[in-house]
């Protein structure tokens, strides 16, 4: 009996000594550099230099915002005990603002009031990035001016570009050039197979559409402009041809989706636009998504927002239409989808006027050209390819 008690005491003391030893042992050594970049894909083990044990959850770190981040790891040490360690990292904005300006850059005499309004200058993270043009110039006087534009974000990242500004006289438009079209019949024969469908996107600019004729030509779907915003902060206007277009399309058995042309610069405004669209389409059957069409790149600087805010705007629109059980997609051209938009989780509608190929498999819809010619529409129309899902 006494011997048994003695053994228990010895065992208890051994466990206490072991636990103290474990606590004193520096089982985790963190990296010397506890930082990463904004939107960098990094897992928590990136910040561990040495671990005397097994990491239980090597999770992805949230790098969607800049600043200090408190993290915690859970691991099993070499003695089998589960331990936790807290530490702090910093997510940094290390990317300079983007300046896009042709060299030379040409404007028509008297047509631009502020040069900074028409030069693309923005930051990946910060709103209201500071852009400055140095050098003398006169937008109301014909001539050449050698200038430099500089930009700096709140993290101190800088960018600059030198360019020549050409202020020129307005020229009369020539009507001598012959308009070229992409014949829909040729396009259909070239690309139609069991993996895709061929369709059009249509707005008031196509005038009165004969949907029976375009359906007979092989069109299986249309993306219709439901409406758009008039300007930054402007009202929402229904496309004048929308009702006729959607009724004509549905009556002739075409699949229908819609798009909204937006000037939104906040999440609140984007959600409001999404609800407006839902109200306009709720009495119709949509087989295809609602697209968010934001393409105000020529005067992007006037919006005063960074790409992070712009992406939140698109995300808000798409998520809001989802709340009403519609699918939301993002429409944009190839350059902006690859360089500005970060919407990896969303379905995309690509505008890219090139030969269609299956390599571009990240896209659900592909607007292949804007000069289509088809029986049933006077003038040109955009032709699209839809992947069969």
Question: Where would I find each of the regions flagged by the language model?
Answer:
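Solvent-exposed, low-complexity, repeat-rich "mucin-like" stalks and linkers
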Residues: 18-52, 95-127
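Serine/threonine-rich, repeat-prone extracellular segments and beta-strand-based repeat modules
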Residues: 46-85, 126-163
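Catalytic domains of cell-wall/extracellular-matrix polysaccharide-remodeling enzymes
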Residues: 286-359
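Functionally critical loop-and-helix segments that line ligand-binding/catalytic clefts
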Residues: 174-199, 343-389
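Extracellular interdomain linker/stem segments of modular secreted and single-pass surface proteins
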Residues: 90-98, 166-175
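Substrate-binding cleft of extracellular glycoside hydrolase catalytic domains
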Residues: 192, 196-210, 215-217, 223-312, ...
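Gram-positive cell-envelope targeting signals
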Residues: 1-32, 66
